[in-house]
UniProtKB/Swiss-Prot annotation:
It comes from the Bacteria. [4Fe-4S] cluster binds at C386, C390, C393. It comes from Escherichia coli (strain K12). Keywords: 4Fe-4S, Iron, Iron-sulfur, Metal-binding, S-adenosyl-L-methionine. InterPro entries: Elp3/MiaA/NifB-like_rSAM (IPR006638), Methylthiotransferase_CS (IPR020612), rSAM (IPR007197), rSAM_horseshoe (IPR023404), UPF0313 (IPR022946), UPF0313_C (IPR024560), UPF0313_N (IPR013704). Residues 685-739 are annotated as: Disordered. One of its GO terms (molecular function) is iron ion binding. This is UPF0313 protein YgiQ. Residues 704-724 have a biased composition (Polar residues). The keyword Zinc does not apply. SMART domains: Elp3. Binds 1 [4Fe-4S] cluster. The cluster is coordinated with 3 cysteines and an exchangeable S-adenosyl-L-methionine.
Length: 739
């Protein structure tokens, strides 16, 4: 079978004729002020990108890629980074754009960037100079769009970035604990681009430059728009109800129009005329020009089962080879979501990463440190996408399931550029990876299966037989990279997908021998089948095989190296017993985790659907379908997090209380098989003191005098009330009997 993919774009990313402004040439940095525009000889910007991150001219930052990509097409692109959103003034600093505003919250969702998994305010921001918090608003996409519209009403606004991408439909919002409308509806933007934006961004920019109104640009893949009805020429499937999909369009009469009755008159035969032979076009695929009507925003907000149903449909329409468009009603309008864009080819990826990035922050930041840049300045991104399909992760929804890899030459050229141009380079490449370290050049071996598959994961519950697990391209890349002059070491900091790695032990040997700096990160996430099945993660058997091979090859190389496993607490499907078993596993293997992560319900993830609805969208949805146990509430989430840090004395009282309630008091003590030690005498006394000082809960029936009492006066009042009512009164003489 041919190895050429059947998923091909209509045209190459760089095949568009350049816009006339290409005569200005590339800018040293995309301008952030009028002074820089004057130095470049620009009277205006064609496109202005507004971002919630600091502007770092590096291919790991989305706005740098989008800006340089548009610049290569001939457009003059300006950047407004982390503007003051209190007024429209900062959004007008570069003047009025000729074509459109591009708005993004940044590399991270602004709410995740601002709040912890426990909804507590963060006091830092890695994407801001000097790690200062508070430089971007909550729901930055909405705020920035409103200010752009306030500044220039007639300029189109196009949303992008991960915040907008994961909010393209009605979605559960963890921070307000409610279902919100599509961000496209709330923001009143003109268009939304989801996922990797190069292909739709270039097409829309050129079509706007040719004078086409944005209201008429409706057929671009990877975009979402607002419509009043379905696009003409599309047929629909109604999935607004559970498991009863059906055609929306009326079924045509099988015999055509009714014929008149025969009048029995003789009819002369018609003369047959010669016709030219014509080639009939191929029959359309069943998914072409087809859309799925999802349950409306109003329906999914009021019915959790319909929400889970809509989520399940959305996740099955993500393969660019066979995905159908989606349509969801919001009030009297519809959000129309076109199918995903065709992935970039290796040649296109090479061209994107070969754009003239400076690989440093904009000079306007001076000597300020940007932690996110410090982390990646010596790293190289070798691929995009992930076919793991983890339920809690948004990478697959954002970057796609098909791996988009760069060529070996392109990666080597970037390593040499880092060596020769980046200040402070010491000869160590901090990472050679991507969303996953070991998916480089891995793809489906069957082009037809790749085009039509709707599986959520290529590796769960088992690795698909069509999936190529040959790590030879990755091994060859590692060897060539570490042989470069001036390169002392190549480290792998991206997470290794160990269930794929065990299929090719050569990769594990190469990794353990040359590319681990003492510790290697992997993410089993849990040890128990209940939560693992909801996460779509492999069991511990794959972990054990990987650890055995890793330890063997490390020993052969004469190195003492360790695995650092990552785990998630409070994930849907996790019961208290599961967390206790995980804690016992950690203690048995002598792991003491410093940083632990509670499950964070981010928009669009399957795990978030489980968290909100209590249903499992990985299986058929119905009102009587499988219910998923969800650990909610601060107390239970704190307990699950505490069990991951069983060794911390601050967590012992909470763990003891939970173990006693679960009937597992035998796990409290000093024996080796115990999880936490028994309380000391001083701890028991302190617990009694705390219980003694507690006050009963107040209700509407509590007397006002008691409500206003302090603990001291309450104690005095209680001692007074314990005496007889007439204790202090003088005794009256008894009445004479028989008077």
């Amino acid at each position: 079978m041919s190895s050429i993919s059947l998923i091909q774009p209509d045209r190459d990313l760089f095949s568009w004729p350049q816009y006339w402004a290409a005569c200005f040439g590339p800018a040293p940095f995309l301008p952030m002020s009028r002074e820089e525009m004057d130095q470049l000889g620009w009277d205006s910007c064609d496109i202005i990108l507004v971002t919630g991150d600091a502007y770092v001219d590096h291919p790991s930052f989305g706005m740098a890629i989008c800006g340089r990509m548009l610049e290569a097409q001939g457009f003059r692109v300006g950047i407004i980074a982390q503007p003051d959103w209190s007024s429209k003034d900062d959004f007008m600093r570069l003047g009025k754009p000729n074509l459109f505003f591009g708005v993004t919250a940044g590399n991270m969702d602004s709410m995740i960037n601002r709040y912890t998994a426990d909804r507590r305010l963060r006091h830092d921001d890695a994407y801001t100079p000097d790690n200062v918090a508070g430089k971007r608003p909550d729901r930055a996409t909405l705020v920035y769009t409103q200010r752009c519209k306030e500044a220039w009403k007639d300029v189109p606004v196009i949303l992008g970035g991960i915040e907008a991408s994961l909010r393209r439909t009605a979605h559960y919002d963890y921070w307000s604990d409610t279902v919100r409308r599509s961000v496209l509806v709330d923001s009143k933007a003109d268009m939304l681009m989801f996922g990797n934006g190069e292909r739709p961004l270039v097409e829309v920019a050129h079509r706007l430059a040719m004078g086409e109104p944005i209201s008429e640009i409706r057929d671009v893949r990877n975009t979402a728009i607002i419509v009043k009805e379905a696009l003409p020429g599309w047929s629909g499937v109604d999935s607004t109800r559970l498991d009863t999909p059906g055609k929306i369009d009326p079924i045509p009469h099988p015999y055509g129009e009714d014929l008149p009755c025969a009048d029995n008159k003789p009819v002369a035969p018609k003369k047959q005329e010669a016709k030219a032979v014509t080639v009939q076009p191929p029959r359309p695929k069943p998914w072409e020009k087809t859309y799925v009507l999802l349950p409306s925003f109003e329906k999914v907000k009021g019915d959790k089962v319909l929400y889970a149903h809509a989520s399940r449909i959305l996740h099955h329409e993500t393969n660019p080879g066979c995905a159908r468009a989606l349509m969801q009603k919001h009030g009297d309008r519809y959000v129309w979501i076109n199918p995903p864009a065709i992935p970039l080819s290796t040649e296109e990826m090479d061209s994107v990463f070969a754009l003239p990035y400076k690989r440093v922050p904009h000079p306007a930041y001076g000597n300020a440190r940007i932690p996110a840049y410090e982390m990646i300045r010596f790293s190289v991104n070798i691929m995009r996408g992930c076919f793991g399909g983890c339920s809690f992760c948004s990478i697959t929804e954002h970057e796609g399931r098909i791996i988009q890899s760069r060529s070996e030459d392109s990666i080597i050229n970037e390593i040499e550029a880092i060596r020769d141009t980046v200040p402070g380079f010491t000869g160590v490449i901090s990472d050679l990876g991507g969303p996953t370290a070991n998916m480089y050049m891995l793809r489906c071996k069957s082009p037809r299966a790749e085009q039509t598959c709707r599986r959520l994961s290529c590796v769960y519950p088992d690795i698909c037989p069509h999936m190529d697990t040959n790590h030879e391209p990755t091994i060859n890349l590692y060897r060539r990279a570490r042989d470069l002059k001036g390169i002392k070491k190549i480290l792998i900091a991206s997470g290794v997908r160990y269930d794929i790695a065990v299929e090719d032990p050569r990769y594990i040997k190469e990794l353990a021998t040359h590319h681990v700096g003492g510790y290697l990160k992997i993410a089993p996430e849990h040890t128990e089948e209940g939560p693992l099945s909801k996460m779509m993660k492999p069991g511990m058997g794959s972990y054990d095989r990987f650890k055995e091979l890793f330890d063997t090859y490390s020993k052969q190389a004469g190195k003492e190296q360790y695995l650092i496993p990552y785990f998630i607490s409070a994930h849907p499907g996790t019961r208290d017993e599961d967390m206790v078993n995980l804690a016992l596993w950690l203690k048995k293997h002598r792991f003491r985790l410093d940083q632990v992560q509670n499950f964070y319900p981010s928009p669009l993830a399957n795990s978030t659907t489980m968290y909100y609805t209590g249903k499992n969208p990985l299986a058929k949805i119905g009102y009587k379908s499988e219910d998923v146990f969800v650990p909610k509430g601060d107390k239970q989430r704190r307990l699950h997090k505490a069990l991951l840090r069983y060794h911390d004395p601050a967590n012992w009282p909470l763990i003891r209380q939970a173990l006693e309630a679960m009937g597992k008091k035998h796990l409290i003590g000093s024996r080796r098989d115990c999880l936490v030690p028994a309380p000391t005498i001083e701890e028991m006394r302190e617990a009694r003191r705390q219980n003694r000082n507690t006050r009963p809960a107040l209700t509407k029936h509590t007397p006002m005098a008691t409500q206003r009492q302090t603990p001291a006066t309450a104690k005095k009042a209680s001692s007074t009330q314990s005496r007889p009512v007439n204790a202090g009164a003088k005794k009256r003489p008894k009445a004479a009997v028989g008077r």
